Regions:
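Internal alpha-helical transmembrane segments of multi-pass membrane proteins
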Residues: 93-108
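Short amphipathic alpha-helical coupling elements at transmembrane boundaries
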Residues: 7-18, 22, 57-62, 86, ...
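Alpha-helical transmembrane segments in multipass membrane proteins, preferentially the mid-helix core
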Residues: 80-91
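Transmembrane alpha-helix/helix-exit interface in multi-pass inner-membrane proteins
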Residues: 30-52
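Alpha-helical transmembrane segments of multi-pass membrane proteins
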Residues: 21-29, 33, 146, 150
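Short, small-residue-biased leader/transition segments that mark boundaries at the very start
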Residues: 2-5
Length: 170
């Protein structure tokens, strides 16, 4: 929904005020979903002496320790992958094609180590709930502020705006 309303805002069909309201509601809804998901994940016991726990702890610490420009650049590339995955999926004719395009786009950002604010919300909630993870609320806010800005820039400037300009010429 966020991507669609952004496209409609660029076209002038929806006010930017309404777009910002939708962004805020989506962001908070994603945060709530991340907290619930992390809470359920913590009930699995996978953080207790498991390789998964070690991986998640190390990833959370790395995410709050990364340099600002590194986070910003990774976030730009991440949302380019995510937006293209969604748009390519929309263009597919079959359900299998839609699913494969979505998986391909998301796996591209995951395997590349790019930064996505919503994915990070879940990582960080797990990290904050786990006493063995050395992250702070300040570190989480540092990451989410930079990554959210990079995700927005990547999606708006490098996907939505060019797509709008191409459509406008047709």
């Amino acid at each position: 929904s966020e991507m669609c309303i952004r496209d409609r805002s660029i076209k002038g069909e929806v006010s930017w005020g309404k777009t910002i309201k939708v962004w805020i509601v989506c962001y908070l809804g994603n945060l709530l979903g991340s907290v619930v998901t992390a809470g359920i994940f913590m009930m699995t016991g996978l953080m207790n002496g498991q390789e998964v726990g070690t991986f998640l702890r190390n990833a959370a610490v790395a995410k709050v320790s990364a340099a600002p420009m590194e986070l910003f650049a990774k976030a730009i590339f991440c949302n380019i992958c995510v937006c293209l995955a969604v748009w390519c999926s929309i263009k597919m004719k079959t359900e299998t094609g839609k699913i494969m395009m979505a998986i391909l786009g998301v796996m591209t950002f995951v395997t590349s180590g790019y930064e996505h604010s919503v994915a990070n919300m879940t990582f960080f909630t797990i990290g904050l709930l786990d006493p063995g993870t050395a992250i702070t609320i300040g570190g989480v806010l540092y990451n989410l502020l930079i990554v959210t800005a990079g995700n927005m820039l990547g999606g708006i400037l490098f996907v939505a705006l060019p797509y709008y300009l191409i459509q406008k010429k047709d």
